[in-house]
């Protein structure tokens, strides 16, 4: 995964092209990309393993497993795709919003616009989407209630 720190756009490419990253593809900056990886970009979790972990945790003390069960539930709800992950705090900072939009509200807005959007089960406060940075900006400008703009 590569990210343009100037405009925020994210992109990915296969390991076979690792040395051949181009500059940012957006119209406004053509900046060099900050590259992370190589990274695994598929789902991290097996639902069968998570189901078994949840079953095993039922025999343990809730004081030990409360946070673990919450994590298992988050991982089960996270399909692991799309690969690009965003923070509502980053959106608020990048787009000069008064405050970060609630995660569930923003996911609902993205879905209403036809995008895939899910909570990131690995990183709390982040969401996964196939929307580009320009599309995220448009949703922020056109769909967020006035209290956030």
Q: Where would I find each of the regions flagged by the language model?
A:
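SAM-dependent transferase fold signal centered on methyltransferase-like domains
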Residues: 1-149
